[in-house]
Amino acid sequence: MIEKVNPSHPDKIADRIAGAIVDLAYQVQPDPKIAVEVLIGHGVCHVIVETSAPLLMPEAVRAIHNAIRRIAGLIQIDLTIVPQDAHLANNQSEGFRCGDNGIFKGIPLTDEQKTLAAIARDIYAAHPFDGKYILDDSRLIICQSNATWADIEKLYPTAEINPLGDWTGGTDVDTGATNRKLGSDMADSVTGGGLHGKDLSKADVSVNIYAFLKAQETGKPVELCCAIGDDTIDGKPYEEIVEIARHHIQSVGGFEAFAEWGLY
């Protein structure tokens, strides 16, 4: 049994905004330290950014506003940008070290999970609006906004479609928050921390990506943990794990693109 939401779900809009701001930080500073939280809904987008990057420059603030409105439309923006905590910054002063305590798990994807991921992308390609999908053995449930029953029935005639009828969805119907759809992003690999709105020094990003990729490659579960400040994980220098995660983020098009669908 698995649930998947698409990139226009309010929670994913929040993740995408957070990812876009992380992308901007990487444009203005090599390997910035950044954490972004987004709460969006009903015409307002609240954003808090903790960062080492110079994002208070007028051109950077404009770029953040432009990214938010590109993703979420015309919306009131409440933006707070503050420096990273000095103790946390000192942890990374001499190279990459784990940015927090954490537990991590990578689990090979099941055929059911791969199937639903493909279905979600297929529907979203035709209907790029808020949607949520569930697959439980042979039972497929499709809740897709801004589409009629007949539209979806043509694609998936045996599915349960919009059980309460047609709907509009989006951030004027439901609020969105960063890292609230980790089951959709990570399947059975969910543990403690979220993937989005963070730089690569954060173990929640790099170790989660590393564990997931290793599980898919080996076909075996992977379980890891770290303490803040660790410089070795799974017998590898943490810097090497960061570079594996960096390559994955780059391969999908950046942090905003990564936030669209998560790990699969």
Predicted features and spans:
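A domain-level signal for the structural core that forms small-molecule/cofactor-binding pockets
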Residues: M1-Y264
